[in-house]
Amino acid sequence: MSRIGNKTITIPAGCEVTVSDKNEVTVKGPKGTLTRQFSPLIEIKVEGAEVKCVRANEAKQTKQLHGTTRALINNMIVGTTEGFKKQLDIVGIGYRAALQGKVLNLVLGYSHEINYEIEEGITVEVPNNTTIVVSGVDKQRVGEVAAQIRGFRKPEPYKGKGIKYSDEVINRKEGKTAA
């Protein structure tokens, strides 16, 4: 029994959810529109101001998809009404970020600068030269872009230099001691 899948999703005011005959869910909200195709094993019903996911049978795969489908629809509703945000911090002497139009320019101690093209539907802000804020309506794409930016210089465990999530804790290691 999927505890998450059995919960109904309440649709907030200003948000509209429609389900097509091919199990394609479209969520329209004040921040934007998201569309996603779901498995035909899960029936998605919109009843008034609630969305309910009902599984077709008790097979293992159907049970797995039940909770996942409900969580994805909930994330679509939250994204179109509130949006998602990831904050990255740059730690290191001389490490900095700058935004030039739709290109994020990163100086991370390499012999060259890194120019990251920001994709459509994602907003990147640089409040100061050591903080990057990635935001958008699609939770998966926001996390993906933040992970790609972090991947340019992951935080190292000795000095903690690199790009890290603002809520991430870096486990520090002790360096070699002279004998």
Task: Show the residue positions of the predicted features.
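N-terminal intrinsically disordered, cationic/polar leader segments
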Residues: 2-147, 151-179
